[in-house]
Amino acid sequence: MRCLPVFVILLLLIASTPSDTVPLKTKDDMPQASFHGNARRTLQMLSKKQCCWYFDISCCLWP
Protein backbone atom coordinates (compact mmCIF):
# COMPACT_ATOMS: atom_id res chain seq x y z
CA MET A 1 0.00 0.00 0.00
CA ARG A 2 2.95 2.34 0.61
CA CYS A 3 4.22 1.74 -2.90
CA LEU A 4 1.06 3.06 -4.55
CA PRO A 5 1.84 6.80 -4.07
CA VAL A 6 5.40 6.24 -5.26
CA PHE A 7 4.11 4.39 -8.30
CA VAL A 8 1.68 7.19 -9.12
CA ILE A 9 4.41 9.83 -8.79
CA LEU A 10 6.69 7.84 -11.07
CA LEU A 11 3.92 7.56 -13.65
CA LEU A 12 3.40 11.32 -13.53
CA LEU A 13 7.12 11.94 -13.98
CA ILE A 14 7.30 9.58 -16.94
CA ALA A 15 4.30 11.26 -18.54
CA SER A 16 5.93 14.70 -18.20
CA THR A 17 9.14 13.80 -20.03
CA PRO A 18 9.92 15.82 -23.17
CA SER A 19 8.46 14.65 -26.43
CA ASP A 20 10.36 13.46 -29.48
CA THR A 21 10.45 16.97 -30.93
CA VAL A 22 13.27 17.91 -28.56
CA PRO A 23 16.61 16.76 -30.00
CA LEU A 24 18.55 14.58 -27.61
CA LYS A 25 22.09 15.58 -26.72
CA THR A 26 24.84 13.30 -27.89
CA LYS A 27 28.40 13.11 -26.73
CA ASP A 28 29.36 15.29 -29.71
CA ASP A 29 27.23 18.13 -28.31
CA MET A 30 29.18 18.32 -25.07
CA PRO A 31 31.46 21.33 -24.72
CA GLN A 32 35.15 20.58 -24.81
CA ALA A 33 35.68 22.31 -21.46
CA SER A 34 33.85 19.49 -19.69
CA PHE A 35 36.28 16.96 -21.15
CA HIS A 36 39.23 19.05 -19.98
CA GLY A 37 37.65 19.38 -16.54
CA ASN A 38 37.14 15.63 -16.29
CA ALA A 39 40.73 14.97 -17.35
CA ARG A 40 42.05 17.49 -14.84
CA ARG A 41 39.94 15.97 -12.04
CA THR A 42 41.14 12.47 -12.91
CA LEU A 43 44.78 13.55 -12.89
CA GLN A 44 44.34 15.28 -9.54
CA MET A 45 42.73 12.17 -8.08
CA LEU A 46 45.55 9.97 -9.37
CA SER A 47 48.20 12.31 -7.97
CA LYS A 48 46.53 12.19 -4.56
CA LYS A 49 46.19 8.43 -4.82
CA GLN A 50 49.87 8.03 -5.70
CA CYS A 51 50.92 8.74 -2.12
CA CYS A 52 48.85 5.75 -0.99
CA TRP A 53 51.00 3.49 -3.09
CA TYR A 54 53.88 4.28 -0.75
CA PHE A 55 51.81 3.32 2.30
CA ASP A 56 51.48 6.90 3.49
CA ILE A 57 47.74 6.90 4.14
CA SER A 58 47.79 10.25 5.95
CA CYS A 59 48.10 12.20 2.69
CA CYS A 60 45.27 10.43 0.88
CA LEU A 61 42.35 12.83 0.76
CA TRP A 62 39.44 11.76 -1.38
CA PRO A 63 37.35 14.60 -2.83
Curated annotation (Swiss-Prot):
Pyrrolidone carboxylic acid modification, residue list: 50
Q: Where is the signal peptide, in residue numbers?
A: 1-19
Q: Which residues form the propeptide?
A: 20-47
Indicate the principal place this protein occupies in or around the cell. secreted
Question: What are the record keywords, sorted?
Answer: Cleavage on pair of basic residues, Disulfide bond, Neurotoxin, Pyrrolidone carboxylic acid, Secreted, Signal, Toxin
Give the GO cellular component terms, alphabetically.
Answer: extracellular region
Paired cysteines (S-S):
none
Tell me where in or outside the cell this protein is found: Secreted
Asked if the Swiss-Prot or TrEMBL record annotates the protein with the keyword Secreted, the reply is: yes
One Pfam family in the UniProt entry = Chi-conotoxin
InterPro entries hit by this protein: T-conotoxin
- Expression across tissues: Expressed by the venom duct.
PTM notes: Contains 2 disulfide bonds that can be either 'C1-C3, C2-C4' or 'C1-C4, C2-C3', since these disulfide connectivities have been observed for conotoxins with cysteine framework V (for examples, see AC P0DQQ7 and AC P81755).
Any one GO molecular function term: toxin activity
Annotated domain remarks:
The cysteine framework is V (CC-CC).
Family, similarity comment: Belongs to the conotoxin T superfamily.
Question: By what name is this protein known?
Answer: Conotoxin TxMRCL-D012
What is the species listed in this Swiss-Prot or TrEMBL entry?
Conus textile
Q: What is the lineage of its organism?
A: Eukaryota, Metazoa, Spiralia, Lophotrochozoa, Mollusca
